[in-house]
């Protein structure tokens, strides 16, 4: 006879929350460190810096290089689709909703900046390496692979 596993109330509630989240989408409105997106977009850069992570604060406390400044000005403008090689610019709330084509060393990866990306580098969203997908062994790789039919 197999004993039944007891299910805790906690796990039932967790599953119910997960199912509800899947139905409704985002559970609550976006906020970054207690501030809504509209508040963040209305802030000046010097008001916003204390909210960013230490690495981003340090990066913005130093001056931006020429390429970063050019991209920053383009992102603040009205242009929709922007192509760039600059991967080390940190996403600010003013950039949300813009579409960027970022170079990954081989091709341009197109993505839209979302509120969840605030405080991250642009380069994090266009990966430079492909995920390795291994297939079967090649001819001569093992002793048994000699007898595999060639394509």
Swiss-Prot record:
Pfam families tied to this protein: Ribosomal_S19
Any GO CC annotation of this UniProt entry: cytosolic small ribosomal subunit
Record keywords, A-Z: Ribonucleoprotein, Ribosomal protein, RNA-binding, rRNA-binding
Cytoplasm found in the keyword field: no
The keyword Manganese appears for this protein: no
InterPro entries reported in the protein's UniProt record: Ribosomal_uS19 (IPR002222), Ribosomal_uS19_CS (IPR020934), Ribosomal_uS19_euk/arc (IPR005713), Ribosomal_uS19_SF (IPR023575)
SUPFAM superfamilies: Ribosomal protein S19
GO MF annotations in UniProt: rRNA binding; structural constituent of ribosome
Function recorded in the entry: Protein S19 forms a complex with S13 that binds strongly to the 16S ribosomal RNA.
Protein name as it appears in the record: Small ribosomal subunit protein uS19
Organism: Picrophilus torridus (strain ATCC 700027 / DSM 9790 / JCM 10055 / NBRC 100828 / KAW 2/3)
């Amino acid at each position: 006879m197999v004993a039944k596993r007891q299910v805790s109330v906690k796990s039932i509630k967790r599953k119910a929350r997960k199912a509800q989240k899947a139905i409704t989408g985002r559970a609550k409105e976006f906020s970054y460190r207690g501030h809504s997106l509209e508040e963040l977009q209305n802030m000046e850069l010097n008001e916003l810096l204390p909210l960013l992570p230490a690495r981003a604060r340090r990066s913005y406390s130093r001056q931006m290089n020429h390429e970063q400044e050019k991209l920053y000005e383009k992102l603040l403008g009205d242009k929709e689709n922007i192509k760039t090689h600059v991967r080390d610019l940190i996403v600010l709330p003013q950039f949300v909703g813009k579409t960027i084509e970022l170079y990954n060393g081989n091709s341009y990866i197109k993505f839209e900046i979302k509120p969840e990306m605030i405080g991250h580098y642009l380069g994090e969203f266009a990966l430079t390496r492909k995920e390795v997908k291994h297939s079967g062994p090649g001819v001569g790789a093992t002793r048994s692979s000699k007898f595999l039919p060639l394509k």
